[in-house]
Amino acid sequence: MRIEEDLKLGFKDVLIRPKRSTLKSRSDVELERQFTFKHSGQTWSGVPIIAANMDTVGTFEMAQALAGFDILTAVHKHYTVEEWAAFINTASADVLKHVMVSTGTSDADFEKTVQILALNPALNFVCIDVANGYSEHFVQFVAKAREAWPTKTICAGNVVTGEMCEELILSGADIVKVGIGPGSVCTTRVKTGVGYPQLSAVIECADAAHGLGGMIVSDGGCTMPGDVAKAFGGGADFVMLGGMLAGHEESGGSVVEENGEKFMLFYGMSSESAMNRHVGGVAKYRAAEGKTVKLPLRGPVGNTARDILGGLRSACTYVGASRLKELTKRTTFIRVQEQENRIFNSL
């Protein structure tokens, strides 16, 4: 046993220090980025935000809607091959370039992903997702996926430390998914005591990944557009959003009505709700590590997407970054004890 004395920070612990700027308007900010990935060699350009691979967020409808904003969607792994085929038949090439195919690490998951990727060559992204990216089996699966799909861009996670980030990149991942426990419907930190404050995880993993020519996606912990800006400021190449995109018309959650008001269910992918739906219940040897919440219906996701992108542009103007790429170089974080004046938040 040992204790690390270094202070670790989450998004709520900091603000971005403003700096002189020559930008006249938020409209001057370029949010699109262009990446060439280490292993796949593929080049992609767009806004580096990803809708999370949760079945109440990462839906085909969400992919259609967010492609119009140049945003990616990691489509959840629970669609059948037939459902994928039907979606591909109606989706444009532009939509497909904004889609990630999500998979687990079982043999059945692998075979299903092989079939999905064979449906259309425009599917260039694979998202290999497990709750605990520290297992040797996971590393071996990433290597197997890289061998099977040498020209596909592979995103793999989740981890929170530099050495494991490096391990996954060296095993074939182009993008490493960073985050254990920060999600709005994740209870891993409560159930297990395991986790890492998200901003510090992003900073440390970005440093490790960029040294090897890899990239990271900050997954979880964003509750408002300012958190997205902080994640990019901390060095994230991509930011993945779950709760911020839940509860919309395109989100795919079940709608319930209480006292004349409609709500949409949103749950973590390790929650009892998710396991009841997909694997017949919580196994006897494990505990649920997610919760289910009811969100007021929020209308079309386009309104929220515009709000997020607008906040991100504004953050860039406050530090003089004319492009999103420049944000991390221009970011100075200050530690704080308050984020906002909350006097009217309950009204």
Curated annotation (Swiss-Prot):
GO terms for molecular function: GMP reductase activity; metal ion binding. The keyword Metal-binding applies. NADP(+) binds at residues 108-131, 216-239. Keywords: Metal-binding, NADP, Oxidoreductase, Potassium. PROSITE patterns: IMP_DH_GMP_RED. K(+) binds at G181, G183. SMART domains: IMPDH. Signal peptide: none annotated. The active site is at C186. Pfam families: IMPDH. One of its GO terms (cellular component) is GMP reductase complex. InterPro entries: Aldolase_TIM, GMP_reductase, GMPR, IMP_DH/GMP_Rdtase_CS, IMP_DH_GMPRt. NCBIfam families: GMP_reduct_1, PRK05096.1. Belongs to the IMPDH/GMPR family. GuaC type 1 subfamily. This is GMP reductase. It comes from Salmonella typhimurium (strain LT2 / SGSC1412 / ATCC 700720). The gene is guaC.
